[in-house]
């Protein structure tokens, strides 16, 4: 699997040689008091342990489907948290399709979150409980992306356009429009959260757990290892994810953007990244960011 994903990343997502970094513009609004360091990603979500079907029906959703996968995206948090493999069954003699992703409130919660963080506590940013509004199309297919919008009380607009290909790739294009007279620094992030570890095969040539490639270096951490010790790394390119015997869920940050990635366990497993260079959004300005999500079978 690791080799396959490395090849996939190299073919489709490896960034070109980076341009010289722009000199930081220090002429920021003096009223904007905030740190210039990427904040920690903290989403403390309690496990309510309701059934999967209850959790799915509890919130509004956008359905998605292509030749290989189907499921839904929760409008509470814009979480990719319901995914079924259409071509794989739980056993050879079963008609029941494999379910990989589950809502956060179910016992076996397993989901993907993308968004923006900020060091300024006076500015609201979307979180896992934010109620997003759908604009236009309400069915996500390879031919029909969806658009989600949320406005905070400070008059800053957050948008997401989510698309899928005909296999296992989601592309999340995020946009911030600053309708205020101040300048703010935002930090794009993405994280995969899993409440419980799966039954592990414990076969020595097969890695199951958290993994990633950071500046061409492969990192593999078992579920038990992460319970004992957090792993952190800074990188200029790469990807990170969580893998089982047959399946993988992974995130690919935007090309040419430096980031910090953490593998952590605090009552649930997390593989995440946050860009370490702030996205400066000035008054009446818009900025964008892209995160790619691969949720795939190990074919």
Where are these regions (language model features)?
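Soluble non-transmembrane domains of integral membrane proteins
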Residues: 61, 65-299
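Juxtamembrane extramembrane loops of integral membrane proteins
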Residues: 2, 11-92, 97-100
């Amino acid at each position: 699997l690791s080799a396959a994903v490395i090849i996939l990343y190299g073919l489709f997502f490896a960034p070109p040689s980076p341009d010289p970094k722009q000199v930081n513009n220090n002429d920021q609004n003096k009223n904007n008091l905030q740190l210039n360091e990427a904040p920690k990603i903290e989403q403390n979500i309690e496990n309510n342990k309701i059934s999967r079907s209850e959790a799915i029906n509890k919130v509004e959703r956008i359905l998605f489907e292509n030749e290989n996968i189907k499921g839904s995206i929760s409008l509470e948090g814009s979480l990719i948290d319901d995914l079924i493999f259409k071509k794989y069954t739980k056993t050879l003699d079963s008609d029941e399709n494999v379910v990989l992703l589950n809502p956060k409130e179910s016992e076996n919660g397993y989901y993907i979150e993308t968004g923006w963080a900020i060091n300024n506590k006076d500015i609201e940013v979307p979180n896992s409980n934010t109620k997003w509004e759908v604009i236009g199309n309400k069915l996500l297919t390879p031919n029909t992306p969806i658009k989600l919008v949320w406005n905070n009380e400070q008059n800053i607009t957050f948008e997401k356009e989510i698309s899928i290909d005909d296999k296992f790739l989601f592309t999340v294009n995020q946009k911030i429009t600053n309708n205020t007279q101040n300048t703010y620094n935002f930090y794009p992030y993405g994280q995969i959260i899993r409440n419980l570890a799966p039954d592990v095969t414990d076969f020595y040539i097969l890695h199951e757990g958290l993994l990633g490639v950071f500046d061409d270096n492969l990192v593999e951490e078992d579920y038990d290892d992460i319970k004992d010790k957090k792993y952190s790394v800074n990188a200029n390119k790469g990807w990170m994810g969580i893998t089982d015997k047959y399946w993988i869920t992974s995130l690919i940050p935007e090309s040419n953007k430096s980031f910090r990635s953490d593998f952590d366990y605090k009552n649930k497993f997390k593989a995440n990244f946050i860009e370490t260079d702030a996205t400066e959004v000035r008054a009446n300005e818009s900025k964008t960011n892209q995160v790619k999500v691969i949720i795939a079978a190990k074919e």
